[in-house]
Every structure is written in C-alpha cells, then in structure tokens.
C-alpha cells in the first residue's frame, strides 16, 4: 500500500516572510506549534486552524500559515492517546541556521527552534532525528536517510527552516552554501537549493505524513 500523501504546512503565505525570533526566542510559527501540541486530543481538523490563528497573533499579522494538501486523517493528534500507544512515530528536525556567504550568517531563532521542536516531538513519543546540514549535499543525504527510515513507521513529521524563497510557484529551502550573490534564477535554484516538495517527499510513513516549513517564501 502506498504511503498517504504528505500535508505541507507553511509558516507564511506565498510571497510572505517569517520572523527568526519572537519573545520566546524562535519563529512565532514554532512557538504556536509547540504550545498547541500540548492541548489534549487536539485533532488535526482543529489543530491546523488554531495554528494559523495563533501564528498570525504571535507574528502581529506578518505570518499567515497555509496548508498544501489537507491531511486525509484529520483525527490524528500530537498527544499520545490510549489508542495511539502502539503507534510508531518518527520525526526529522532539519535546520539550516548558518550561511557561508552572508554578512549576518547565523539564524539564531532557527538554531533555538531545532532544540525546542525536537524536545516537543520527543515528548509526544517521536523518535527524533536532528540534522543541521552545512551544505546541499549533506541536506540531501539527511533526506534520503529519513525517507528510508520513515517507511517503517506509522507517523512521519518533518520540521524544517532556514532561509527560503519562492520562485515560479515553488518554495525552496536555501542550504548553507547557497551562492546568494548570484541571485535566484531557475537554473541556480535547481542546482543549489532544495524544493520544499523534495523535503516533504521524505515522509513515507504508513498512516500520517506531515511537513512543517517555517522559512520565508519571498518572491524572486
């Protein structure tokens, strides 16, 4: 049986930007995700609208989350209920927080969110893989490894952030070695960036597959 389709939840709308640090030290989207995941029996059908509302509030309207491909299983929830005790869960926290060619190379909020999100997921019974790849090659390696592992699990979640852009309708995560001074044309993005769809495709669990992308979607 093929894996269920992956639902991708973006921290902002197409063309939008995100905040690296809020009052809690990270992205407002991450803060909202962590807080809402603690609610008992917060099914996805209620969780996703609440995540959107909370992120808008915490970012003072700058970030308006959107969801691509709604989950087919909307009754699933982060808290482990009695019926979900036997559920096998795996998560990848994929963070790009350092950039080689930028004047301000570190995303301090992204680095903080690696720890915050990993802790939250572990608390909900996930086997958590943390990856901070220094370049595109390592990023692809982390995705291949996770794809192979996630096939043996019931639920797979990826949380990813770093600098991001949107180009011709597709959103990209920019690796730490991206050549920013050369711009963002189609060829450069194909050779040096990673589409969010590629990140989402690493989720191959049997029941629920979710990807959260917290980077910007700045138009190029």
Name what the model sees in each region.
Residues 1-220:
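Cysteine endopeptidase catalytic domains of the caspase/legumain-like
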